[in-house]
Amino acid sequence: MFGALIKKIVGSKNERELRRLWPIVEQINHLEAEISSLSDDQLRNKTTEFKERYARGETLDSLLPEAFAVCREAGKRVLGMRHFDVQLIGGMVLHQGKIAEMKTGEGKTLVATLPSYLNALTGRGVHVITVNDYLARRDSEWMGRIHSFLGLSVGVIIHGLDDDERREAYNADITYGTNNEFGFDYLRDNMKFSLDDYVQRDFHYSIVDEVDSILIDEARTPLIISGPTEDSTDKYYIIDRIIPLLKKGEVLEEEANTLSGKRKRYTGDFTVDEKSKSATLTEEGVLKVEKLLKVDNLYDPRNMETLHHVNQALRAHALFKLDVDYVVKEGEVLIVDEFTGRLMPGRRWSDGLHQAIEAKEGVKIENENQTLATITFQNYFRMYEKLSGMTGTADTEAEEFHKIYKLDVVVIPTNRVLLRPDFPDVIYKTEGEKFNAVIEEIRELHAKGQPVLVGTISIEKSEVLSELLKRQGIPHNVLNAKQHEREAEIVAQGGRKGMITIATNMAGRGTDILLGGNADAMAKQWRRGNPEASDGEYERVLAQFKEQCANEHDEVVKLGGLHILGTERHESRRIDNQLRGRSGRQGDPGSSRFYLSLQDDLLRIFGSERVAKIMDMLKIEEGEAITHGLITKAIENAQRKVEAHNFEIRKHLIEYDDVMNKQREVIYAQRREILAGEGIRESFLDMVDETVADLAAGYAIDKVPAQEWDWQGMGDSIYKIFGFQVDIPAETMERLNPFNLRELLQEKVRELYTAKVAEFGDELMDHLIKVIMLQSIDTQWKDHLLSIDHLKEGIGLRGYGQKDPKQEYKKEAYQLFMDMMLRTREEVVEKIFWVQIAREEDVEKMEEQQKRQRLVFNLGDEPEAQQPVTSKKVGRNEPCPCGSGKKYKQCCGK
């Protein structure tokens, strides 16, 4: 109560933040008359003036009012669009490194030009991240006109560009692109053999559009670059044939006299847990699979790979559905993005799951790939010095943004009052009853001409609904992953009179639905059909379309605007809000309502028992609908339960992934140092000395006479690595101790190294060391990633041994990393001392062979996430980031 009183007096945190920014808005408005009086050249010269003032020490914050005023004026002159006051506030929030929540239709794309322009004045680059190539290209061409007018360069990163084109785009003042392309470019750069081949530069400032989709929805999906393995694909077909012979069972609970109270019992051959998306063999199932595959023991270490593929095949059949999770197009399995409904060509599930689904669908199986490089979006975006984001729906996840990413959410007020009523949910007992009611409402609204946007959560459901509408003779458009190419065109006309649009998911569609239709889109479509038409004809047709759309707009407004009809609740309230947000933009009228059934996935998995009890209590008959506060509350509780469950998973995974991320930073930093050629020979000699020291320490035992040391073992190890025989006279051996043995060996090894340098020459030797170091690091890192994957798969079982899996994972991942570093060092030293080169071309051939790898770009199935920290170079006296507790110079920085 006291907190509520304080809030009433001083306002909420969001209100206080907005109050703090309004005086700056007034400053910008005060400058408008002065700035608008400038000529185009004078306005453009302001950019040069700002850059000079920044170079002299003025801060971006002090330049902000003038810079925003200049950018606003450029928008008016170039696009005929003036930034509203609330858009200026949105721009300030983004500049501060926060998330701006702006409702659909409030002009997020235009808002981004303000902080982009201001931060580009530093000359260090600004990255504007969008969710697909279409939006990246559109925004770079559309909003890029403002920046180009003001003298800044604009680039765009989309699929299909070569390295030179990418480098040019990254070197621009402002670069637009997709999150996937930016992430993969980072991984590709860190696999290259020359710094000159890198395309990206420093990570200065990033504005992420649909930030909730990227930092929350895709939090557990790593980007993976992989190379093919040589394994046969026959095993996938063999295992796939036995899966239909297995019977799905269920988990039963029976009373037991144990401390836990109840004991689980399983029926059938396997059980499915839809919450965790897992399928598990029962004891009977294991015996049946062993018999079918003619395997003695599925859990024998030699058969663990077979067990893994059986589990993935189970998941493929029991949990992944055609036209929901993926589609089959032209003999290829294509993933459907569950958050946006888009197809993701070129992306594959990892760890054998994609191959299992290919076997299930009877299409050609592509070889399984081995991970060469991987990163999550969180780990990529946390490298930016300043990160900001925009979305229409972030407030429901404000706590997670703050706790995990230290990003505050500021809700920006709308330019005009929202007039959209959101009607209570209508619930039916069965899906069939629900669809009948949906069709009836669509028919009524269509009869009076009101446009309707129907939201579904899968391609399968959208096609069922489309078929029902066809039977009723109701014309409509379907917008799902299968119609990706027509997406913008369909969305643009979704607000025309009588238009019915079915959409799988509206997240990130990027095109506003204008009541009455979009005249520009209609004119462009006309131009595609009339390519020979003159500019004059085009302008005349555009004017006609504008008049037609304006008249239709007034009619649609009288009919109540765009009606949103949701056919199922998503697991996240935010996705539901994104669908609702397509209506009521910029003060337009609109409405929304969700139709649900007890057979919907959300209610069936997470909340049906409570809802069913309420419906029974209220004596709801079959075919009868209910709209009741208790039901709506129960549904919201189910959604909160799912959101909390997913939040806990992401938070938990962050702690796991932090270990891997620190190790990656160490490896990539080492690669960069090698590529830069800084002290490469000194680094190699340090490796040599450490290898000798380890050998001496391993065989020469203090307080044990030298004659009793394991000279045979020492000699074999020295010969294996350095290629010479240990020959120490008896009188010298008597005087040896571990310290002077090390000195003796180091002296001999240095002599051999000097002879190698004399044989090859300084330049060739340095080049050889560089190539072998990179080869060894890349090979060992690739194997380490595989080891980490295997460790991650089995670490959960440690809980049964009363051990904390998280701590066990950190400890073992650290040990694996240190073992990898040791193997890398020994491999480099051994190769250099044994290598024989006839010509310099041999070294270049080694380098070229390493470069020639067929790479595959995947979205991983393994969940990962990460807490952001500021990335910086590790000092030699700072603690090592691998977690050993040692100084960097004494650990991974050796």
Curated annotation (Swiss-Prot):
Organism encoding this protein: Geotalea uraniireducens (strain Rf4) (Geobacter uraniireducens)
Classification via SUPFAM superfamilies: Helical scaffold and wing domains of SecA (SSF81886), P-loop containing nucleoside triphosphate hydrolases (SSF52540), Pre-protein crosslinking domain of SecA (SSF81767)
Region (Disordered): 857-894
Name of protein: Protein translocase subunit SecA
Entry-linked HAMAP family: SecA
Residues involved in Zn(2+) binding: 880, 882, 891-892
Compartments where located: Cell inner membrane; Cytoplasm
Enzyme class: translocase
Cross-referenced InterPro entries: Helicase_ATP-bd, Helicase_C-like, P-loop_NTPase, SEC_C_motif, SecA, SecA_CS, SecA_DEAD, SecA_motor_DEAD
PANTHER family: CHLOROPLAST PROTEIN-TRANSPORTING ATPASE, SECA INNER MEMBRANE COMPONENT OF SEC PROTEIN SECRETION SYSTEM
Cofactor: Zn(2+)
Residues where ATP binds: 87, 105-109, 512
CDD domains recorded: DEXDc_SecA, SF2_C_secA
Gene3D superfamilies from the UniProt entry: Helical scaffold and wing domains of SecA, P-loop containing nucleotide triphosphate hydrolases, SecA, preprotein cross-linking domain
Lipid bilayer topology: Peripheral membrane protein
Cofactor binding, note field: May bind 1 zinc ion per subunit.
GO CC field: cell envelope Sec protein transport complex; cytosol; plasma membrane
Record family assignment: Belongs to the SecA family.
Job description of the protein: Part of the Sec protein translocase complex. Interacts with the SecYEG preprotein conducting channel. Has a central role in coupling the hydrolysis of ATP to the transfer of proteins into and across the cell membrane, serving as an ATP-driven molecular motor driving the stepwise translocation of polypeptide chains across the membrane.
Catalytic activity entry: ATP + H2O + cellular proteinSide 1 = ADP + phosphate + cellular proteinSide 2
Molecular function, one GO term: metal ion binding
Subunit structure: Monomer and homodimer. Part of the essential Sec protein translocation apparatus which comprises SecA, SecYEG and auxiliary proteins SecDF-YajC and YidC.
EC number assigned by the record: 7.4.2.8
